[in-house]
Amino acid sequence: MIVGSLRVRLLLRDSRSLKDKRQVVQSIKDRLRQQFNVSVAEVEAQDNRQVVVLGVAMVSNEARHVRATLQQIAEALRRHPVAEFLDHELEV
């Protein structure tokens, strides 16, 4: 069993409130779950209206598949129209 994790930091410059942030974060989480079949949670900075830290996890029997999927997720978030990609950490 191979477990992979991805930690991504994003910046929401236009977020005026925690409610604005929650709407964007929920949309991102739902899309990642649906498109990639992974577990996603906001893991840090919940009280900061502009910073988002997401944790993504997945399990597979092939390390290559886990790494490729998590890299695809990082690239998808890098291209997100609302959130600015700050950095990421990937572990397999």
Residue ranges of predicted features:
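C-terminal structural segments of small proteins and small subunits
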Residues: 58-92
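C-terminal binding/interaction regions
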Residues: 21
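A short linear hydrophobic-aromatic micro-motif
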Residues: 38-43, 85-87
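A structural signal for short, well-ordered beta-strand segments
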Residues: 6-10, 54-56, 88-90
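Short, charge-patterned binding micro-sites
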Residues: 3, 41-62
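Short glycine-/aliphatic-rich beta-strand segments at the starts of folded cytosolic domains
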Residues: 4-13, 18
